[in-house]
Amino acid sequence: MAYNILLMGASYGSLLASKLLFGGHSIHLVCLPPEAELINAEGFRVRLPVRGRAEPVVLDSRKLPGKVTAGGAAGVNPADYDLVGLCMQEPQYRSAGARELLDAVAKSRVPCMSIMNMPPLPYVKRIPGLDYEALRPAYADATVWDSFDPK
């Protein structure tokens, strides 16, 4: 069964998308307009260095079984997806567009995974005995996580 997957972020997201495309899933990358235009026109390529090989292995999204599209955050409805991936660096979630989409993701209750450079604050809140409030200043803007239910 193929799934519709929303990935916020094209840089980290392309790496994860390349793996998911092997499974025949449909991926939508949320990114900046110039990135979206390029991905929609030419797909993306991920180069993976492999020990013992002179050249990296190149994964071309156009040659994989799944389908990838890209676009900005405006107008994206998380409820249209089976899974959301958080694939941007933590400070980027406070930017206009990303902040609103992240809030919509939280309120949609669609399953959400993260490959961020630090764990989302609601994920940290699940750790028993940890002073969650003491960690809020470590985030660029901890309020972007307030709509998420850590359960």
Q: What residues fall within each predicted segment?
A:
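Rossmann-like NAD(P)(H) cofactor-binding subdomain of soluble oxidoreductases
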Residues: 64-151
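Short linear motifs at secondary-structure transitions and domain/linker junctions
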Residues: 2-5, 20-22, 59-62, 87-90
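Weak global preference for isoleucine
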Residues: 5-8, 22, 27-30, 39, ...
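Generic local-structure boundary detector
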Residues: 16-19, 23, 38-41, 50, ...
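NAD(P)+-binding Rossmann beta1-loop-alpha1 motif at the extreme N-terminus of oxidoreductases
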Residues: 1-52
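Conserved N-terminal Rossmann-fold NAD(P) cofactor-binding segment
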Residues: 31-81
